[in-house]
Amino acid sequence: VVCQDKQLTKDEYHKLLGKAKMVFSANTQETLGISPYEGILVGAMPLVPDRLSYTEMYDDMWKYDSRWTTSYASYQINKEKLVNMIKDDMQNYDNKLPKLEELKQKLTDMYFSATNLLNTIHSYGEKENKETKEKSRKISLTV
């Protein structure tokens, strides 16, 4: 188990991440969840709290009860549950790999790719162009 308590360069971070089987988050503030996703890309399974963006992005099998890490005191109370969950996940790593691949694809498609956003913007542009052309046609017919 590695806790990052020192500054790493991006290269050092990615090398360490490439050796990991799990990426654990106890974040109480997170907007995108990039660290667990980076881990998933190199085959590390995520274990994230059921809060923040993680609630929407991750299935239950990758989440733990968010109350377990809302504070150091709550972590101390729930430490055994969390340790048991980590042990269970690590022992079942090989069995979880197919689900990890599914998760990687889901996150890539839904949250870490511009394809959906670009398609949506493009469809709005097409709709706008169609409406503009229709208005122009009506104006030219009345003139």
Task: Go through the PLM ranges and name each one.
Residues 14-20:
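Short alpha-helical donor nucleotide-sugar binding micro-motif in glycosyltransferases
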Residues 14, 37-41, 55:
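Short alpha-helical segment that forms part of, or immediately flanks, the ligand-binding pocket
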Residues 50-66:
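Short acidic/histidine- and often glycine-rich active-site loop of Leloir-type glycosyltransferases
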Residues 45-48:
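Short hydrophobic beta-strand element within catalytic cores of glycosyltransferases
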Residues 1-7:
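Nucleotide-activated donor-binding/catalytic signature segment of Leloir-type glycosyltransferases, i.e.
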Residues 23-24:
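A short hydrophobic beta-strand element within the catalytic core of glycosyltransferases
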Residues 27-28:
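Aromatic "clamp/platform" in nucleotide-sugar-dependent glycosyltransferases that forms part
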